[in-house]
Swiss-Prot record:
This is Glycerol-3-phosphate dehydrogenase [NAD(P)+]. HAMAP family: NAD_Glyc3P_dehydrog. InterPro entries: 6-PGluconate_DH-like_C_sf, 6PGD_dom2, G3P_DH_NAD-dep, G3P_DH_NAD-dep_C, G3P_DH_NAD-dep_N, NAD(P)-bd_dom_sf. Catalyzes the reduction of the glycolytic intermediate dihydroxyacetone phosphate (DHAP) to sn-glycerol 3-phosphate (G3P), the key precursor for phospholipid synthesis. Belongs to the NAD-dependent glycerol-3-phosphate dehydrogenase family. It comes from Deinococcus geothermalis (strain DSM 11300 / CIP 105573 / AG-3a). It is found in: Cytoplasm. It catalyses: sn-glycerol 3-phosphate + NAD(+) = dihydroxyacetone phosphate + NADH + H(+); sn-glycerol 3-phosphate + NADP(+) = dihydroxyacetone phosphate + NADPH + H(+).
């Protein structure tokens, strides 16, 4: 499926938005990168490099930059929405309802619900989610990577696939929108926990145990929400968890490490989705009687109610059980 070199709006000029705009050009298309701040957009257009969020990656000539949202989406079939989750509601409210929406943030709506549900509640009929083990620093440089676009609208998923697939980026489609979206949400919390382990210098055994039990916790939650179990072990589940929990590029892992050292978890103004997600998921689990022990521990530590040591002890002190026990 080809777009014939058409223009693709990329709404959000952070690191991931910038990397996706560059990826669009590698697939043979033009991209319009929208930045909310006019001064920032002007600087990007002039310098051709996002020194604030993705230094070292130059914007190709096929990427235009604007702060005019109407201009950015004019004539487009769909747009990649790449702002942090807290900014998604306001951005969606300003977009035409016949536009296809591809959500690229790995977070939850303000009420703790799914961003795809929020988009549909606002009147968007064509909605998809893009997720996978994709660090902007590597995708922007053209290092090999793979990702998943999921939607109930398979035609839209196919168009997004054609927009991004290239010799350096494998793009798979999926009909499991719930699993792909929520896998990207929950892995951020598990990555925060692995950062706590790193910051406390608890060793490789502890990290391996945390990641493995975290995957189990992810699986229970995703399946309870209607996801396919196979998705848990795909790129948007296990793949994204491995990348986020182990990489030096991971904001969430770095935030957990910073908390363990007694430092502020958000550095350089970059959004750490897992900090907010942990509290929302913990509140949901408590209200619905679900056992998400790692999420609970991270939420308590992130809120300052528990120290990192107390959080780890809460996990190590749980009752004895079978490994496969729910």
């Amino acid at each position: 499926m080809s777009l014939g070199g058409g223009n693709v709006p990329v709404l959000g000029a952070g690191g991931w938005g910038t990397a996706l705009a560059v990826a669009v050009t590698r697939a043979g298309h033009r991209a319009t990168l929208w930045a909310r701040r006019p001064d920032f957009a002007a600087r990007l257009a002039s310098e051709r490099e996002n020194g604030e969020y993705l230094p070292g990656v130059l914007l190709p000539a096929e990427v235009s930059v604007t702060s005019d949202l109407t201009h950015a989406v004019a004539g487009a079939d769909f747009a990649l929405v790449v702002v942090p989750s807290v900014g998604v509601p306001d951005l969606l409210a300003a977009l035409p309802r016949d536009l296809g929406i591809v959500l690229c943030a790995k977070g939850l709506a303000p009420d703790g619900g799914r961003l795809t549900d929020l988009a549909r509640s606002l009147g968007f009929a064509r909605v998809a989610v893009l997720s996978g083990p994709n660090h902007a620093e590597e995708v922007g440089r053209g290092l090999p990577a793979a990702t998943v676009v999921a939607s109930a609208d398979l035609e839209l998923a196919g168009k997004v696939q054609a927009t991004l697939i290239s010799p350096t980026l494998r793009v798979y489609t999926s009909a499991d929108e719930v699993g792909v979206e929520l896998g990207g949400v929950l892995k951020n919390v598990i990555a925060l926990a692995t950062g706590l382990v790193d910051g406390l210098k608890l060793g490789d055994n502890a990290k391996a145990a945390l990641i493995t039990r975290g995957l189990r916790e992810m699986g229970r939650y995703l399946v309870s929400q209607g996801a396919h179990e196979d998705t848990v072990y795909g790129l948007s589940g296990l793949g994204d968890l491995v990348a986020t929990a182990t990489s030096r590029h991971s904001r969430n892992r770095a935030a957990g490490e910073a908390i363990a050292r007694g430092e502020h978890p958000q550095q350089g103004g970059k959004v750490v989705e897992g900090l907010r997600t942990a509290g929302l998921l913990d509140a949901w689990a408590s209200a619905h009687g679900h056992d998400l022990p790692i999420v609970h521990a991270v939420a308590k530590v992130a809120s300052g109610e528990w120290t990192p040591d107390v959080g780890i002890r809460s996990l190590m002190g749980r009752g004895a059980k079978s490994e496969l026990e729910e």
